[in-house]
Amino acid sequence: MAKPDITLRLERPEDYHAVEELTREAFWRSIRGFCDEHLLVHRLRKVPVFIPELDYVAEADGRIVGNIIYTRARIEDPSGITHEVLTFGPLSVLPEYQNMGVGKALMLHTFEKARKLGYRAIVIFGHPDYYPRVGFRRASEFGLTTSDGNTFDAFMALPLYEGALDGIQGRFFIDPVFESLDDKDVLEFDKSFPPKDRYVPVPIKVLLDRLDAGAREAVEGLGCTYLDEFTHRSERDISSATGLDEKAMDIVRQVMLEHGWRWGSKQKEWR
């Protein structure tokens, strides 16, 4: 499919169910067989930290194909002083419109809107090989940690103007709504959508069978049961395993692509 003409606009109440349905489609490939992001979107709109001025949809071919939703979050420094920042997510794009720049368009548009609204920075949890393409850096570079004091490649920050995070260090907190989802609620909410077969994750064996003995041992040492688990880890993280040379990493990228994932920093296009 050729890249579509995309129109960006604010989400309207009459869009809500369609956006939840596209979010369900975008995130259905979950190791547990179903996703909860559509219920999260439903609940996010009802919390005080939701920012309707940054709740944008992307339209193409006469329908909604993408959505980005923002909430206010905070950084708490060691002295207890808090600094307001943004977080976004889910960022959803219909599968058939992924890798066409829809997600990137939504991000760049809303980054500028957020800057004009006076927000200083955006802090997210996301794929560490994708989001640096639009300016995100590891949060640890800014002296930020998660609420429990950890840091990792998938925890990233983007200052919205020069010096926006200067002198600000500490722990990052998001709204409790992100932790409010349990399987019972998700499956009950899911009844309001068309029936959908549970997703079956891809066993790691499909990759192991393509690798030589040394690389196979290295991947086994990562402790992954499913290939899907690589989608949450950076190329830098995976390639650091002893025994995975560039030839092996090329095989990893190829196998990921064969199963529908554009994974790794060398991929030319993503969402």
Kindly give the residue locations of the regions a language model identified.
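Conserved N-terminal entry element of GNAT/NAT acetyltransferase domains
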Residues: 1-14, 21
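Conserved acetyl-CoA-binding loop-helix of GNAT-fold acetyltransferases
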Residues: 88, 93, 99-112, 123-124
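Compact, charge-rich alpha-helical regulatory domains located at protein termini
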Residues: 200-271
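Conserved active-site alpha-helix within GNAT-family acetyltransferase domains
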Residues: 116-120, 125-150
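A conserved beta-turn-beta hairpin within the catalytic core of GNAT-like acetyltransferases
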Residues: 73-88, 98
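Active-site rim helix/loop that mediates acceptor-substrate recognition in acyltransferases
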Residues: 20, 27-75
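Acidic/histidine-enriched, glycine/proline-rich intrinsically disordered or flexible terminal extensions
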Residues: 162-199
